[in-house]
Amino acid sequence: MDSAPQQQPPVEFETDPSRYRHWQVSFDGPIARLKMAVDPAGGLRPGYELKLNSYDLGVDIELADVVRRLRFEHPEVRVVVLSSGTDNVFCAGANIHMLGMSTHAWKVNFCKFTNETRCEMEDATAFSDQIYIAAANGTCAGGGYELALACKEIYLQDDGNSAVSLPEVPLLGVLPGTGGLTRLVDKRKVRRDRADVFSTTAEGMRGKRAKDWNLVDGVFARSKFEQEVMKRAQAIAAAPIKLLPGERRGVTLGPITPELAAHARLYRHVELSWDREARTAQILVRGPSAADVAVVTAGDEAIHAAGDQLWALRAFRELDDALLQLRTNHLDIGLVLLRTEGDPAQVLAHDAALAASREHWFVNEVLRHMARVLRRLDLTSRSFFALGDVVGNGMPAFAGCLLELALAADRFYLLDEPAVQVGLSALNEGALPMSHGLSRLAARLYGEPDKFEALVGQRGLMDAEAADDAGLVTVRLDGIDWADDTRMAIEERSSLSPDALTGMEANLRFVGHENETSKIFARLTAWQNWIFIRPNATGPEGALSLYGKPQRPHFDWNRV
Amino acid sequence: MVSTTVDLNSKIPNNVGLSDDVKLKRALESWLPSYLEWWNDMGPSDFADKPVFLRTAVSVDSDGWAHYEHVKMPDYRWGIFLNPREGESTIRCGDEVGKPAWHEVPGEHRNALRRIIVTQADTEPASVEQQRLLGHTAPSLYDMRNLFQVNVEEGRHLWAMVYLLHKYFGRDGRDEAEELLQRRSGDPDKPRILGAFNQPCDHWLSFFAFTMFTDRDGKYQLAALSHSGFDPLSRTTEFMLTEEAHHLFVGETGMDRIIKRSAELEKLDPDGDIRRAGGIDFDLIQRTINYWFTYSLDLFGGEISSNAADFFATGLKGRYREDRYEEHKAMGATYRLPVVENGHLGERDVPLRNAMNEVLRDSYVTDCERALRKWNRTLEESGSPTRLTLPSRRFHRHQGIYADHCFDPQGNLLDRSRFEANQRNWLLTPADNEYLLSIMKPVYEPGKFANWIAPPNKGIEGRPVEFEYVRLND
């Protein structure tokens, strides 16, 4: 049972509305209704039923797709009302039986993905003027309340019974791991002593007290609930704001269907390949062609018209899919080599044109999407080495938005050869921030502010030596040393403890201050992942293992 | 809000030392006006000033728990009683069986106990609300009195549960006690917690079916809780059971008297047309049984339940007559349950602890089958060829593993369209209710009974059937 998820067919992350099993989306002008109606028989894996609107990875893959499509395909939407299609239950959170029977890795990947989805909802609220409001027309427990917490406003039905709750600690011996604890005190500013009471009170809170403690923004009687929530939605939709310009015509996200080979997934701009024996994989991203650059330099309308075929959108959707594939379906791959191919000058030209159009709503969406994909990379628990060497006939193209791959990587090896060049664009200077808000350039040069200052505003290409001097390169190697040195580095890295590396990389990548999002992925997730392997949660007598079973849990009372 | 200061101890008969318990006294003092306000708003409509021949529990002694006199309902003395105990109570089931029972709420089990008590408590005022208009269509003074007896005792059962909330659950308990008076049966905004307690019960056939089937769920819940390791809950529910027996008597004999009368009318009418003779035909009675029995089955909770397993494992709730079982841990054993898998009915073994709701439901179904046999004996003795049946426990369910599937009353799987096509033959319809309301005219003359129901075999507490059980002319 323990390894069941891995023996199953690989998980695919691409979906579209025609395939949804768990969500209903409808539109009325600027208001979208998003109803969670989880099909109990629609679990991604056998062995559990998704009762009471509880969710698994499959449910969340659809939600992530909904959130993304709302931004690209429905730019007219200003408010997204999230409610339940099941009477009296908003959402019961992650399916406990699914968690109980999952491997550690599955749990961790599941939590990470759901966290990213909730951050996407907040990102849409902050940067796409799509405000999520949770209409909790029933009990809102655990991950269900955490889903509501990801919305800007939360309304709860006041029927003497419906409550919001975080019962994970008292009932399951784990944490509300989808940002619940963090959003409670950091986002909603619930007093921390009250948050302590709330998070240990299994039955949660309802009605007036939920409102008084700021656990929700309002409570409405059952018979008026729908009406009051919609009134609020209409008020938000009608509030005057300065929308980004550009015709609000949606861009359909077509499938990116990769070609599947024995040890590779081949996309149009991206190739993911893996070597199980060596426990390494490679992601190769090809830079924009001259034709791709011509599209962006033609201006807003041409970019909008290119739609989902725009290089910057297509390539990063492909990269996103490749990362998710690695995370979920290739657990034994420890080291990922990031390579780029193309003309770095074209990348810079591309970036300059895209940055010039960034006020257009669609370009804004493209840039926000690129940023999210890069954050997914930052948060992927694999070692990343960026390798700037010659690929086949092509030159590496670590410039602008593709230089972000090198800056996200744990190390950047660059071949010292005259034809190999790197360069910065406007996109390296804050347009694609990490989850804690810093640009990757600022994070890379956190301890060398002078070098950082010197690079800001610098455009054009530099050779390997200049890049090394500027602090962009970890190891610069000439053609004689390259093969041996990189081979040894790769083999050495692959021999180290994967757990220690995961922890080390997560610490080193995020220099500087924390924010709410980074706390969710660092503090909350790290503690949760520790608790997940502790006997008190997942041992034979642990609370999570025994949930729903006839035995009662027994704890080891020693504090660690 | 009415403001009252009363000498609680003389007003509230009790054996819980109320006069010496300042904290409890204070809590009840502030709750009492809200309770009376609720009773006036939601209790029996219009008969507040009529003396009713009521049984009042004034003590737990054998001569004190059933004290009869004519009382106006608002003056009824709602008391608080715990069954006395000899010796030390112990935990009766689960992992801790045999250890001393709890006399305070253990923090570890606070949430579970609160949930158990609030859910039980919520049903008590709910049934009063559901039945509040029935006095206006009572088929006799005898029946009217029984209705009011049931109502005041359901009120007392609310007191019994509120006592536990006030005494043992601190501020949260007081809040919950207040909420119990805020929820209303069938209210779209603040419904009662459980489904059957939000169904309308607007004529006497439903009243009798309700007291027969739904109150019988109450009996089994109380019986299971009377084996709780939380001693005050165990002792409270034990005492409630003595009163509950009367409610079941009202339901079971009420149905029996209707069946008896229908059999008589069947013979009286030349074509055997009971309706033409102003009675209630057997198909309609069968539909009523199907309706209320199945709604009541839902009250036992899911067939496979982690809560049920927890409640048993922790010793908070036992089985029916737990003391008659030899083994009280129920670990390792399984229960074979019919389940729907891939569109077919099969069987599955589930851990016994997780099946405790179903185990309790088994005891309940056996009891209902006994009553059905009794009614069928009445039919047999009356010479009627009709026999009534209990539907399958899979039929017409809204909770549990059968809720998402359709079954016929025999328990065979059906597709939804066939279920819907037959629904009016199986379950109460609006036309049924219209007909029943049309024949339910009040009969207020002592000793007289409505045409659709037979008189009882005997009166109450040695009084004749003609006794003026409710003094409407006072």
Mark where each language-model region is.
Chain A
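Hydrophobic, small-residue-rich alpha-helical packing segments that form membrane-like cores
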Residues: G93, M98-A105, N109, F113-I131, ...
